[in-house]
A protein has these predicted regions:
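Short S/T/G/P-rich N-terminal loop/turn motif that feeds into the first structured element of a domain
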Residues: 1-51, 58-68, 91-93
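Conserved short beta-strand edge segments in small beta-sheet-based binding/regulatory domains
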Residues: 36, 76-91
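Short, conserved loop/turn and helix-capping segments at secondary-structure boundaries
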Residues: 69-73
Length: 93
């Protein structure tokens, strides 16, 4: 299993609560629709960054496939424009 964690900041002036809801509604339903994506959680952060994404994948290959999957790319189009910065970490379990 691979765990994928991403921390984001949003652009200045973006409503953080509304943005996190859009991101959550776009990405969390992908579980069960993209092979190898086992779990997805998106939450507003209270310290350091604006929100955190936590996900689990069956394998490294399934994480790689997720990144370019058409459903993931379509979901990103709904919110990518209000993201400012991103830090990610992936690790095996």
């Amino acid at each position: 299993m691979v765990k994928h964690i991403v921390l984001y900041t949003l652009k200045e002036g973006v409503d953080k609560k509304a943005a996190v809801e859009i991101i959550r509604e776009s990405l969390e339903p992908l579980v069960g629709k993209i092979p190898g994506l086992l779990k997805m959680e998106i939450r507003q952060a209270y310290q350091g960054m604006d929100y955190a994404l936590y996900s689990e994948f069956e394998t490294r290959e399934s994480l790689t496939a997720y990144a370019s999957h058409e459903l993931h790319l379509a979901a990103k189009e709904k919110f990518w424009h209000f993201l400012d910065s991103r830090v990610a970490a992936d690790y095996d379990c």
